[in-house]
Amino acid sequence: KALTERVQFDSTMSAIDAGDYLELPEGSSAAAYMSDGSTMEEIFVVSCKDKTDASAVKIAMQELLDSQTQEAGRYQPEEAERLNNAVFATYGTCVVLCVTSDTDTANAVIKEYVG
């Protein structure tokens, strides 16, 4: 939630069910937000029970990101660029994807929570 409040987004962000977009391993918890507008901005934060599950979630997120980037490349090249520059990393058992132009703030907020 801190990401939605402190990072600059071009569109309004609304909570979504991460399970609609990713297959979540048993025992994991997730928070996700997507843009209400015509941007590809989004946030996925998935906390997994172990690093094996986190690796599987990261692969699934990469596939989602790749497919969105390919789609955006056809119709919204500026959004494809934003997707290519997304903050996307695993911190222990937590996988974070944040698509925004404000990557510096996103990285700072994430570091506060994951160390």
Regions picked out by a protein language model, each given a short descriptive name:
Residues 1-115:
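Soluble, non-membrane globular domain cores that form compact, hydrophobic packing
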